[in-house]
Amino acid sequence: MSVKHFIQITKPGIIFGNVLSVAGGFFLASKGHVDFALFLAVVIGTSLVVASGCVFNNCIDRDIDHKMERTKNRVMVQGGMSLPLALIYATLLGVAGFSLLYVQANPLSAFCALIGFVVYVGFYSLWLKRKSVHGTLVGSLSGAMPPVIGYCAVSNSFDLAAVTLLVMFSLWQMPHSFAIAIFRFKDYSAANIPVLPVARGILAAKKQIVLYVLAFVLATLMLTLGGYAGLGYLAVAAAMGLYWLYMAWGGYKAEDDSKWARKVFGFSILTVTALSVMMGVDSQTAADVLMTYAR
């Protein structure tokens, strides 16, 4: 056991992705007036909570991870960390993360983090992931919480913008996850995990990807229409979303489903990254947007 194992078991890639969306929500609410001490506390606190959830997930999934090519070398599978130590580590990470958000930000942001944590560890990892084709849908709520945490840490209000962020990122999670399930079809099938492509077929997953991307595109526009983001954000959201939709629609003609799914997955990351950046650099008050429309 080494320091490397303590880092790997937290899934750094997932933490980094969540930091981007946390920052997007935080800067959206800040509207150009950034409290960098608060920002640092929110990023670290959320990262610790996400890390805790990932370690608990590793503990829960250790019996199926060895069946999947992409997870067979995880720390728990390879015996790099004992279960008791991993559980203690996960608990300490969680306590530290929730405490930091509660004390340095506000109870609302900590509560949002708690909801995401409970959904991911309890409802998704412990239950629905192995039992239901709808596990991805429920799990998407946890993946959508980081930008909401960032937003609420500043605004201390669960308003229309927070709801929009929750809907946006939940919708984004679905085609993103379905694409992974398609190009990792053999892994999920071997582990008997009832993701949509395995349970109902790849064609059914393609249809759902198109529908969810379309819904996502419409949801992204609401930040500008609701008066929270500017026209620059709107232009980027529309361009990225429509191209992602075009790419998703191409799945009906794809000769290689795995190759197509990897492209959809890759562009999903580019899309959410671009939107997170634009939320931060082009946030506006409702009055600003209304004045722009009135000119």
Curated annotation (Swiss-Prot):
**Classification lineage:** Bacteria, Pseudomonadati, Pseudomonadota, Gammaproteobacteria, Pseudomonadales
Q: Which organism is it from?
A: Pseudomonas putida (strain ATCC 47054 / DSM 6125 / CFBP 8728 / NCIMB 11950 / KT2440)
EC class of the enzyme, as a word: transferase
Record-level Gene Ontology MF annotations: protoheme IX farnesyltransferase activity
| Name used for this protein in its record | Protoheme IX farnesyltransferase 2
Instruction: Write one Pfam family the protein is assigned to.
Output: UbiA
Which key words are in the record? Cell inner membrane, Cell membrane, Heme biosynthesis, Membrane, Transferase, Transmembrane, Transmembrane helix
Catalyses which reaction(s): heme b + (2E,6E)-farnesyl diphosphate + H2O = Fe(II)-heme o + diphosphate
Membrane topology classification: Multi-pass membrane protein
Q: Which gene encodes it?
A: cyoE2
What this protein is reported to do is described as:
Converts heme B (protoheme IX) to heme O by substitution of the vinyl group on carbon 2 of heme B porphyrin ring with a hydroxyethyl farnesyl side group.
Its pathway, per UniProt, is: Porphyrin-containing compound metabolism; heme O biosynthesis; heme O from protoheme: step 1/1
Q: Output a single Gene Ontology CC term carried by this record.
A: plasma membrane
Q: Where in the cell does this protein reside? A: Cell inner membrane
List residues traversing the bilayer.
9-29, 36-56, 83-103, 108-128, 135-155, 163-183, 209-229, 230-250, 264-284
EC number(s) of the enzyme?
Answer: 2.5.1.141
In Gene Ontology terms, what is a biological process of this protein? heme O biosynthetic process
Instruction: Answer whether the UniProt record assigns the keyword Transferase to this protein.
Output: yes
| Further comment found in the protein's record | Carbon 2 of the heme B porphyrin ring is defined according to the Fischer nomenclature.
Disulphide-bonded residues: none
Name the family the entry cites: Belongs to the UbiA prenyltransferase family. Protoheme IX farnesyltransferase subfamily.
Can the keyword Methyltransferase be found in this entry's annotation?
A: no
Superkingdom of origin: Bacteria
